Amino acid sequence: MQFSVAAVLALATAVAALPPASGTGAGQQVGHSKNDFPLPKELTTKQAADKCGDQAQLTCCNKTVKTGDFTQVEEGLLAGLLSNLLGAGQGSQGLGLLDECTNIPVIPIISIASPQEKCKQPISCCQNTKSSADGDLVGIGLPCIALGSLL
């Protein structure tokens, strides 16, 4: 009985001596604070639209779907050989598709930081023509690319 009382008191003392947890409990990165494709603050909307080119529009997208971002453990002598040769092995970043996009008006003196604060996902360049994979043999349609990945 004496051992269990001593053990309980030691445990209570150790727990009381722990430092408090940091943060607010709401997550360490709030909102758009972690952007995979950050843009320079001095970049204007006109410069950003020029980077997109004349076949794409500057847009603000509110949905990103990332696939393929995982770690795979291979076993055996030749395990993972084919996937590593095709570039799908460890370290591959996956594919990011942007959806639910709206156009950003191009005003030469407006900084890109203003629309970027309102976007839930990275500012992107989207094709002017509708990208559809309906009826195609391969079926790939990638209409939007994050602007930060082009800089």
Swiss-Prot record:
This is Class I hydrophobin A. Aerial growth, conidiation, and dispersal of filamentous fungi in the environment rely upon a capability of their secreting small amphipathic proteins called hydrophobins (HPBs) with low sequence identity. Class I can self-assemble into an outermost layer of rodlet bundles on aerial cell surfaces, conferring cellular hydrophobicity that supports fungal growth, development and dispersal; whereas Class II form highly ordered films at water-air interfaces through intermolecular interactions but contribute nothing to the rodlet structure. It is found in: Secreted; Secreted, Cell wall. One of its GO terms (molecular function) is structural constituent of cell wall. Induction: Expression is highly induced by the biodegradable polyester polybutylene succinate-coadipate (PBSA). Interacts with cutinase cutL1 in a pH-dependent manner. Self-assembles to form functional amyloid fibrils called rodlets. Self-assembly into fibrillar rodlets occurs spontaneously at hydrophobic:hydrophilic interfaces and the rodlets further associate laterally to form amphipathic monolayers. rolA rodlet formation is regulated by the strength of ionic interactions between rolA molecules. Three types of self-assembled structures of rolA are observed: spherical, rod-like, and mesh-like. Belongs to the fungal hydrophobin family. The Cys3-Cys4 (residues 61 to 101) and Cys7-Cys8 (residues 126 to 144) loops form hydrophobic segments involved in adsorption of hydrophobins on hydrophobic surfaces. RolA enhances the polyethylene terephthalate (PET) hydrolysis in the presence of the recombinant polyethylene terephthalate hydrolase (PETase) and the PETase-hydrophobin interaction has a high potential to increase the rate of PET recycling. One of its GO terms (cellular component) is fungal-type cell wall. It comes from Aspergillus oryzae (strain ATCC 42149 / RIB 40). It holds the Pfam family Hydrophobin. Residues 1-17 form the signal peptide. Keywords: Cell wall, Disulfide bond, Secreted, Signal. The gene is rolA. The keyword Transmembrane helix does not apply. Its main location: secreted. InterPro entries: Hydrophobin. Disulfide bonds join 52-125, 60-119, 61-101, 126-144.
